[in-house]
Every structure is written in C-alpha cells, then in structure tokens.
C-alpha cells in the first residue's frame, strides 16, 4: 500500500464511513423507537381521561411556561414529576384536589412574582389534567429530571 492516499482511496473511505454511520444512526433510531414504545411508556394506563388531559395541556399551552420531562419553556416549574413532589402520585383523588386547589388559589398581583394565568377549568377538566400529570409521573425517565424539585 502506498504512503499517499489517492483520490479513489479517499472516496472509498468517505463512502464506506458514510454508509457505516448512516446504518448506525438508523439502528439507534429504531432502537430508541422500540424502547419508547415498549419499555419507557405504559400505554395500558392511557385512559380516555389521560388523553383528554393531554388535550387540555395542549389547548391551554401549558408547555409555553412549564417543562414536561425537560421539554418546553423554563419559565415555570417542571411538571413531569409534580405529583410525586406533592406526595399524591398514588392517590388520584388527592391529586385532583391538590391540583385544583393550587390552580384556583394562585395569588395575583404580587410585585416581582411570576403569575400563572387563571384558566377557569371545570372539575372534569381538572380531573383529566390531574390524570395526565399522574400518568406522566409513571414514565420511566431514567431519573430525569436529576433533582426532585424538577
């Protein structure tokens, strides 16, 4: 083999390396998809109430201020583990009451404090939103966020 890389050798290394890394990327993409569909998320827990809660989350643009499992804005707290932080992850009725009470009692007009808007949700919407947040607490995030405070 010669000491100098020829144009043909360089081309072959480029194409071979490109194909190799495209195959690796494809395999990792498939692996991530399979993991997300089979292990990370328990779809058996996706009740109509959880799905409706997700729609309420999207309709009210909660992600514009909050993060959910690290995705979203960092203006307000992470909500992926909020039910665990509040100590109501295993009690749906307490989760509903806690979420409703907290959202309805938001203090207003405090100077220098970030303010969450009042959404005027119905009890059914509060229940669905709390079910959605309870469901997000069951997702295997591999210990993300790294602290309990979100």
From Swiss-Prot:
<comment type="subunit">
    <text>Heterodimer of cytochromes b (large subunit) and c (small subunit).</text>
</comment>
<keyword id="KW-1003">Cell membrane</keyword>
<keyword id="KW-1133">Transmembrane helix</keyword>
<keyword id="KW-0479">Metal-binding</keyword>
<feature type="binding site" description="covalent">
    <location>
        <position position="62"/>
    </location>
    <ligand>
        <name>heme c</name>
    </ligand>
</feature>
<dbReference type="InterPro" id="IPR036909">
    <property type="entry name" value="Cyt_c-like_dom_sf"/>
</dbReference>
<feature type="transmembrane region" description="Helical; Signal-anchor">
    <location>
        <begin position="13"/>
        <end position="29"/>
    </location>
</feature>
<dbReference type="GO" id="GO:0009055">
    <property type="term" value="F:electron transfer activity"/>
</dbReference>
<dbReference type="Pfam" id="PF00034">
    <property type="entry name" value="Cytochrom_C"/>
</dbReference>
<dbReference type="GO" id="GO:0046872">
    <property type="term" value="F:metal ion binding"/>
</dbReference>
<comment type="function">
    <text>Component of the anaerobic respiratory chain that transforms nitrate to dinitrogen (denitrification).</text>
</comment>
<keyword id="KW-0812">Transmembrane</keyword>
<keyword id="KW-0813">Transport</keyword>
<dbReference type="InterPro" id="IPR009056">
    <property type="entry name" value="Cyt_c-like_dom"/>
</dbReference>
<keyword id="KW-0408">Iron</keyword>
<keyword id="KW-0349">Heme</keyword>
<keyword id="KW-0735">Signal-anchor</keyword>
<protein>
    <recommendedName>
        <fullName>Nitric oxide reductase subunit C</fullName>
    </recommendedName>
</protein>
<dbReference type="GO" id="GO:0020037">
    <property type="term" value="F:heme binding"/>
</dbReference>
<dbReference type="GO" id="GO:0005886">
    <property type="term" value="C:plasma membrane"/>
</dbReference>
<feature type="binding site" description="axial binding residue">
    <location>
        <position position="66"/>
    </location>
    <ligand>
        <name>heme c</name>
    </ligand>
</feature>
<keyword id="KW-0679">Respiratory chain</keyword>
<dbReference type="GO" id="GO:0016966">
    <property type="term" value="F:nitric oxide reductase activity"/>
</dbReference>
<feature type="binding site" description="covalent">
    <location>
        <position position="65"/>
    </location>
    <ligand>
        <name>heme c</name>
    </ligand>
</feature>
<keyword id="KW-0472">Membrane</keyword>
<keyword id="KW-0249">Electron transport</keyword>
